[in-house]
C-alpha cells in the first residue's frame, strides 16, 4: 500500500510540473494596460458626489499610486488611494 501512495504522489508531481506554464515577460505598455484593468473601481472627485450615478473612473491601489498615475480623491488614506491615469 505504501508503494501505491508513492506512485500516486510521483504521478501528481509529474502532472504538476508538466502543467506548469512559464510566464511571459510583458512590456511596460502591456503592464500599464493590465494594471488599469485590475483592482477595485472607485469614484474620483471628478465623478460627482453621488456614488450610485458615478462612472467609477479610478482604481484602488494599496499604499500609494504608481508612477504615471495620480491620486483622484481629496481625502487621505494610509492603507490605499483612489488613482487614475
Curated annotation (Swiss-Prot):
What GO CC terms are in its UniProt record? Answer: extracellular region
Which InterPro entries does the protein's record reference?
Myo_ane_neurotoxin_sf
Q: What is its main location?
A: secreted
The answer to whether UniProt assigns keyword Disulfide bond to this entry is yes
List the expressing tissues.
Expressed in ectodermal glands and in clumps outside of the extodermal layer. Is not expressed in nematocytes. In adult female tissues, shows similar expression levels in mesenteries (gametes-producing tissue), tentacles, pharynx and physa.
Q: Which keywords describe this protein according to UniProt? A: Cleavage on pair of basic residues, Disulfide bond, Ion channel impairing toxin, Neurotoxin, Secreted, Signal, Toxin, Voltage-gated sodium channel impairing toxin
User: Anything further noted?
Assistant: Nv1 toxin seems to be encoded by 8 different genes. 4 of them code for identical precursors, whereas 4 others code for very similar precursors. In the genome draft, 6 additional loci are also correlated to Nv1 toxin, but they are not predicted to be functional genes. This high similarity may be explained by concerted evolution.
Put simply, this protein is called: N.vectensis toxin 1 6
Q: Which organism is it from?
A: Nematostella vectensis (Starlet sea anemone)
